[in-house]
């Protein structure tokens, strides 16, 4: 499990965080311990039988690990039943299987944390042309809302180190027999 680009425990991941993962079929002989999926469930989600995760990571980790950033195109006011401010971005970097590979709108609001130079900024710090990283959560009506926006690498690196130290403290408190740092 990775969060903010560093190893994490599931307890470190806030509820609702949009995650990416790699999954396997159960080990031979373990299939009986897992409830079987109905034909209807498998039709809706053909990958549902792959239920053993060997990698889970948040958006900032997933995209930065693969060399992807986002370029801000601007903001616009959304419409519909729950109008919210939208951050218009386009992907910068390689095409990623299982990722967002076209320009997209992310919901932003006053609860979105915007980081620059290791400090919290307000929405006025967002400018077209900036290259950013984001963490997402599920918004209303199947939209993706931003929880965090990092306007520079320094801020994301600081978050990565904070998470790494949190994970090391957890491992030490659980008496892991050895650790190579």
Where would I find each of the regions flagged by the language model?
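Short, flexible, surface-exposed loop segments at domain boundaries
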Residues: 2-181
């Amino acid at each position: 499990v990775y969060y903010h680009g560093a190893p994490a425990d599931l307890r470190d991941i806030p509820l609702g965080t949009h995650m990416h993962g790699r999954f396997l079929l159960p080990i031979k002989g373990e299939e009986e311990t897992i409830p079987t999926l109905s034909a209807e469930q498998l039709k809706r989600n053909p990958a549902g039988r792959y239920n053993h995760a060997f990698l889970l990571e948040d958006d900032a980790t997933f995209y930065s690990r693969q060399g992807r950033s986002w370029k801000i195109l601007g903001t616009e006011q959304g419409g519909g039943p729950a109008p919210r401010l939208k951050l218009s971005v386009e992907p910068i970097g390689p095409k990623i299987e299982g990722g967002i590979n076209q320009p997209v709108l992310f919901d932003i609001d006053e609860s979105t944390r915007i980081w620059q130079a290791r400090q919290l900024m307000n929405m006025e710090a967002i400018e077209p042309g900036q290259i950013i990283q984001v963490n997402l959560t599920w918004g209303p009506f199947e939209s993706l809302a931003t929880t965090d926006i990092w306007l520079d690498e320094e801020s994301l690196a600081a978050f990565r180190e904070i998470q790494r130290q949190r994970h090391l403290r957890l491992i030490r408190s659980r008496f892991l027999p050895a650790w190579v740092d």
